[in-house]
């Protein structure tokens, strides 16, 4: 218990930063707007009428914030009818939007200052390639070969938004800022309604991405803090206090309550944390926990996560959100790939003098396959082909210039090949290339009111070069005898590009 409290105070002590006065500074909102324009996911401060950032409206907002009844009037206006009181609703909607964007920027300041205050000798080295999504796959190739079971976890959202506010109390002592956060969340939901609170999370995620991202990252870092502590102390858990992963506030009361509900629970099951080979990966609201051991051990971990979220964050998560898989007998969808660790048999002939032996060796290999059906469904949704995979024209692009049409189709094809370059079998990618190439030809033929055959004969090799991917260009230098689009030598070659930091719905259809 004392060891856990010391670890908690060392890494998560409350910060004595008061950020509320910064909300009265005009440059904060200008910085938030500029940050959204330059970010990887542009987030503009807009009004309900799609009007962009206005310094004049920001000045009016700051003046009104000094008024005593500003917040009360804002709540009243937000509950009024849009048609009957459009002017007041417009200002209320705009002020709420711009305040939430500015608050998200201001709330990140204590966390940034804490990182800057760390001694230089304790700084974690930063590698640019760690930003890439593909940097995960080489790690999985090295680690998953020695593991047995995998838990695929869908990280649950807190049902009640007040939980998100309480999590920030451990890090920020600025009470006015916390009250302001409650005001923003109250703007999106009726706090007395459970169903409305669940809907408000998705509404907040859609309209205020930066604020939602900040709250979600705070929640994720909180639960990963407990998981990291248990992971570091796994070899000492049988001797440590059994309640170290519970919430720090009202610790004794919760311990007694937990002890009454589940007498002797910890003493009997603490041993299942003794696992030195455990690896954790988080991505897109999901997490993967892989380790050695038995299936019974993984079931214990599943029960732990259910009770962990229930008693640490006061909300129930469905056990079906945690899927248990055996790596040798099943595959799992991960960032657009179907991944698995199958066992393959390798027959080796050993010759010793006049005697020869056949040695049967079993090996594991981290296999990644591109799923054909979901990708074709994504192309069908984007109107490049039918549901069965037959290419069709895209009429909405017929008004563009010919080279713009070629560039758009070629860029989609190159992006698909670029992202799925680590696939062990690339037949699916060549099928997608055929669909996009023929869809492009039919779109151009429709624009010029011609046939596909006539149009392709007129363009010739120029049309094909637009779909010649970067990966094939690299291999064509290695194998000079290959010709355009007859090249098939890269089927078994796997390249993980370390410059991919985001993916779209077309590349990642499984989610």
UniProtKB/Swiss-Prot annotation:
Keywords from the UniProt entry: Chloroplast, mRNA processing, Plastid, RNA-binding, tRNA processing
The protein's name in its UniProt record: Maturase K
UniProt xrefs under PANTHER family: MATURASE K (PTHR34811:SF1)
Family (UniProt): Belongs to the intron maturase 2 family. MatK subfamily.
Compartment annotation: Plastid, Chloroplast
Record flagged with keyword Chloroplast: yes
Gene this chain is encoded by: matK
One Gene Ontology biological process: mRNA processing
One example GO MF annotation: RNA binding
GO-annotated cellular components: chloroplast
Primary site of residence: plastid
Its biological purpose: Usually encoded in the trnK tRNA gene intron. Probably assists in splicing its own and other chloroplast group II introns.
